[in-house]
């Protein structure tokens, strides 16, 4: 029950600021509840498959999802995530804390770049105006494999990396990149979850507790997002992975 209540409170906070919670879930489970980090990674990654599903549907209805690109990047992302989960399961726990924390700090830097450099930049979608060439296809495949392996190895969603890749490499608009990132994360989470599950690291009771708390909390928190100053939301989105990384280093 303590895990559900904690995840509920965390979900409210994350839903309010609109930040990704994978790193926070890992940090809370390992630091507060002393869950082994491999189990925490498996739980966090699998939980993302459920929490992003509603986001994908919502963004698709708004027309912010590039289905073909998302399908290709996500498909190869699932392969990369499965491979990454096999690699992550071999990393000793004491080293995995450092690696995951490092990835969270790096994701904060990428989030800063996205929010500062791209947020107010008008950009036409190159995807609509150019042929789907072999070079473009290779970019999709590489983006999927790299971000998928990162997510599978370290249990984080890699959303800032995926979003920047979609904008810089594939020419999507900011709106398209947000919605398409949700679609990409879905198969990545499934692939990584299957990989960790096959290694015996997925605790289904723990997963259910995390899902109940975070999904309910995020729904409540999102209701209050419009009342927060925009600068506070941007600051919170950058500092969330930083705080999660610091918590992991305390373990």
Predicted regions: what is each one?
Residues 1-12, 31, 37, 61-153, ...:
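Juxtamembrane transmembrane-helix boundary motif
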Residues 11-73:
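Juxtamembrane transmembrane-helix termini in multi-pass membrane transport proteins
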Residues 25-39, 159-176:
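Interfacial segments of multi-pass membrane proteins
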Residues 44-48, 181-185, 206-207, 211:
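Short hydrophobic/aromatic, small-residue-rich stretches within specific transmembrane helices
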Residues 50-62, 187-203, 249:
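Membrane-interface helix-cap regions at the ends of transmembrane helices
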Residues 176-191:
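Hydrophobic alpha-helical transmembrane segments of multi-pass integral membrane proteins
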